[in-house]
Structure formats: C-alpha cells, structure tokens
Amino acid sequence: LSEVKGISEQKAREIARQMAEKSEMRSAMMFLQQYGISVALGVKIYARYGSGLYSVLKENPYRLAEDIQGVGFKIADEIAGRIGIHTDSDYRIKSGLLYVLSLAAGDGHVFLPRSILLARASELLGVEASLMEKHVMDLAMDRKVILKEMDFGDRREPAVYGSAFYYLELNTARMLKDLDVSSSQPEEAIRKRLDFIEKKNQLTLEELQRQAVIEAVNHGVLVITGGPGTGKTTTINAIIQYFELEGLDIYLAAPTGRAAKRMTEATGYEASTIHRLLELSGLVEDSSAGAHFERNQDNPLEADVIIIDEMSMVDISLMDALLSAVQVGTRLILVGDVNQLPSVGPGNVLKDIIDS
C-alpha cells in the first residue's frame, strides 16, 4: 500500500492493522456463532476480551455472566454445555449459586438462608445440595458472598448475602445511627407551640400525635407507622407546621410520582419523588438500578427536615442513596405502613428499621 501514490508508510501500516483487526474479529464472530451467540452479543464479548476470548470460553465461560451485560447465567450455562464443561464444574456451581441469589434479589430479598440457597441451587443445577456447601465457603473466601449467622424460627444457620447488599445494609444502619442525634428542647415549650397550631387550624391532636411531634423535635430520626386512618397525615401536617414556625427548610418526598402527588394533596406542601430530590441524572425515575444521583455525601441536601412518605416502597439501594445525601443535623422522618405495597427492589427497609 505504501507504494500507492498518496499513501504514506505510516498510513499503510494503520490500514494493515485495521484490516488484521477486522479479520480477527470476523474469525471470532464465526467461532462464537458455533455456540449460538448472536453477532450483537459477540461484539460485546470481543470488545471485552479481544483474542483472549478463546481461553476464557475454554477455561470458564461463566465469566461471561459476571463480565458482560446481557449475558446471564442461563446463556453462559448453555455455552458451557456446548463446549463440554461438566455439570458439576466448580465454576458452574459457584455461578449458579450467585444466580440463585440474584433471583432472590429480584423477589425483594437481600439474603437467603444457606439451606434455602442450596436447595434452590440443587434444583437449578441438578447437583446435590451437600456437595455445594464448600462452594458457598469458596464464594465467601472470595468475598463474593457474606455469611452471617441468624435465627430462622426454630433453627440457626448462616444467611448468605450477595456482598453488595450486605454492605448496603451495613452502611444504611451506620448512617441512620449517625443521623439519630438527640436534642433536649423542653417538652412544655413544644406543647405550647402545639396548642397554638391546634388553635390556628381548629383541630385537636391526640396525645400519641403530640408525642410524635415531640419525638420529631428531639430526635434526628423518627419513624411514624400505622395503617390507613390512624392519623399519620394529621401528624405529618403538625410536624411540618411546627418546623415551619421555627423557620426551618423542609423537604417532602416519596418513592413514586403518584405517592408524591398524594403527599402534596394531603399536606398542601410540594412533595417530589426521592429520585428528583436526589437529582437523578441520566435515567428514568422510579428505577434506582445503576442510577447516578447529583446529591450525595459530597453534595448533600440543604435541608433542616426531610419527611419521606410511603417508606414501605423504598428498597435498600434507594435508602442508601438517600442517606448518603443527608447531613448529620438534618431531621429525617420516615412515614409508612409495613402492610402496604412493598418495595420492587431488594430490602424490606421500613420493617427492618422498625424491628431494630
């Protein structure tokens, strides 16, 4: 090519390199298609591994499930079967165990009791549960799962967490503890202000509702729970008016647009979704999977009081993102009913907070 007029030696080398790369990629696509892999997926695999894809597929095709978006356990297992990987392969069993945990997360669970995990994996993989106990330990050694002893009714055994969910739970608990800063405003002064709010709004607060306001004033974190008709909305309104009289900045939010609209209608104050409150960037609201929030520990919310309604619908990932954006000194009030709609994502956050 360098002999062709107008093509320098450097340009000729670049053209030759590109042609060789295209030839190599074409060969890789033909190789992958033997195992039922589409061209689109093949391009992703080649982009990730290059010419190393041959050794990856030969040694451990289950790496695809971890490394390539769009390749789950099922596809990797199908490829492994075509290549001739044994059904009791260590790679297959460990990948299958992680897949069972991911299915549980899709159903809202951040962990499974080990016996349940092994039983489900046995059904999926066709391998005896007892033969897979060592693989659970191997995953724990690799920090891909975390084991935590727990009581499950009449038995005690390890709960098996995917590592990410374990640390989300741990981090959430730590941040809630840090936020729960007590103050000591005199109860008599709080009650006098509540008398003023009652008179102004021509309402009568029950003693339990007054106590909730007192707790909100004197604690960094408060949970208000109860079924429909138990006075949660009246209590929230009293809390809002109390802090408004103190000149504090109050933010209201809920997990979904519909819940935020109901909160606005019930209180008369503007509420947003949690995603909008945290300034979701680049993704659709009501889906926190992989979301990037502009509000975080480096750019926290500038609020004195944050009230979150419909907490039963908040999953562990969204809760972690919310707490990361709340400064110590901000009062956080969580409102909800554990018997209402659960979160779509993993983690029964409201119930766990109440139980703790």
Predicted regions and their residues:
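Conserved ATP-binding/catalytic motifs of P-loop helicase motor domains
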Residues: L1-S356
